[in-house]
Amino acid sequence: MIKIYDTMTRSLRKFVPLTENTVNMYVCGPTVYNYIHIGNARSAVAFDTIRRYFEYTGYQVNYISNFTDIDDKIIKAATQAGVSPKELSDRFIAAFIEDTKALGVKPATQNPRVMDYIAEIISFVESLIEKDFAYEADGDVYFRVEKSEHYAKLANKTLSELEVGASGRTDAETALKENPLDFALWKSAKAGEVSWDSPWGFGRPGWHIECSVMATEILGDTIDIHGGGADLEFPHHTNEIAQSEAKTGKTFANYWMHNGFVTVDNEKMSKSLGNFVTVHDMLQTVDGQVLRFFLATQQYRKPINFTEKAIHDAEINLKYLKNTLQQPLTETADEQELKQFVIAFQDAMDDDFNTANGITVVFDMAKWINSGSYTEPVKSAFEKMLAVFGIIFEEEVLEVDIEALIAKRQEARANRDFATADAIRDQLAAQGIKLLDTKDGVRWLRD
């Protein structure tokens, strides 16, 4: 039984889907004006792991993750680069797909883009105005937060506690608002900016409305899970809830999940602090699976500190798991012990997707395998566990070919043909295969 820590209730809750055996989840994707950094990648990897575990347990997952392809930052970066916002966003969408593929992130069921939903956004805003939850002011449209009965409950705040500009975005039109906390649903166009015609004149969507529209258009008025980074809890997800529930009168999401930050020297990794490393740059020297494994070593809600040592440790541990998978199969293994490993793994992951505990089980199982318990069922169970973490090794050299060469080497040694035996060892070494001569015979490892 999977239990999820729900940010809205600040409690661990049993997962009950809206539709049996199906999970509909929406995860906020990147604003595509630059390469993603390791902190951004944490969200992609964390929710991909969550998706994979749902699939491991038999669920069908509809996984939606958007691209914000029009935004103040995109407009600014495009202007500086001398290209259109679409050209810039297309470039970094392609980069995001390439980077996350290297991290073993499965393609989303759908990746909606804001520019493809302008008509639906306008219709959504019109509905909010009709219901008196929104108002037009000089070409802008704002949401009335005071009409939202439980505004900011997700962030465990009250209206009186909130400060103007909590989102960190410049609010030059405060004088136009009925309440300084009201947020933009539609922004009037500035000279030279990309814009679309609307009942309120030319303009473009506000940031928060975009995800509400794409999520409900694709998954319906109520979804099972909405996820994203902890920094989106307020104001982004708070505002999504307010406008979505104002329009539909229904609960927007049944479970809210937020991943913790990647830190550097215990400070949040961010572009504003200048302490970030892009995935694109890291992949020049570090294998994508190593980065992914590093990000999985902590439970998704907890912060994880980025250090060279942590990356090095991930590389060593990943190599150990790879070598474990490549052990020769044995004829027997304790089926009851295998069952206990599977149960322990599921218990760990059922507890709010605790990857740290899940990985501990994986290493305990690897130790058991290396002690001589590696039948086909054991291998299958082990591979399925690793796949939850996105760890899938490609076979560079087929086992049957390796075993055939080892047999030839053994025959050469028996005939005291050491030149041939050494040549076979060198041939295997060139293919990344290391031979270990033991009293029980020859073992081999991928280097």
UniProtKB/Swiss-Prot annotation:
GO terms for cellular component: cytosol. A motif ('KMSKS' region) lies at residues 268-272. Keywords: Aminoacyl-tRNA synthetase, ATP-binding, Cytoplasm, Ligase, Metal-binding, Nucleotide-binding, Protein biosynthesis, Zinc. InterPro entries: Cys-tRNA-ligase, Cys-tRNA-synt_Ia_DALR, Cys-tRNA/MSH_ligase, CysS_C, Rossmann-like_a/b/a_fold, tRNA-synt_1_cat_dom, tRNAsynth_Ia_anticodon-bd. One of its GO terms (biological process) is cysteinyl-tRNA aminoacylation. Zn(2+) binds at C28, C211, H236, E240. Binds 1 zinc ion per subunit. It comes from the Bacteria. ATP binds at K271. A motif ('HIGH' region) lies at residues 30-40. It catalyses: tRNA(Cys) + L-cysteine + ATP = L-cysteinyl-tRNA(Cys) + AMP + diphosphate. SUPFAM superfamilies: Anticodon-binding domain of a subclass of class I aminoacyl-tRNA synthetases, Nucleotidylyl transferase. NCBIfam families: cysS. PANTHER family: CYSTEINE--TRNA LIGASE, CYTOPLASMIC, CYSTEINYL-TRNA SYNTHETASE. This is Cysteine--tRNA ligase. The gene is cysS.
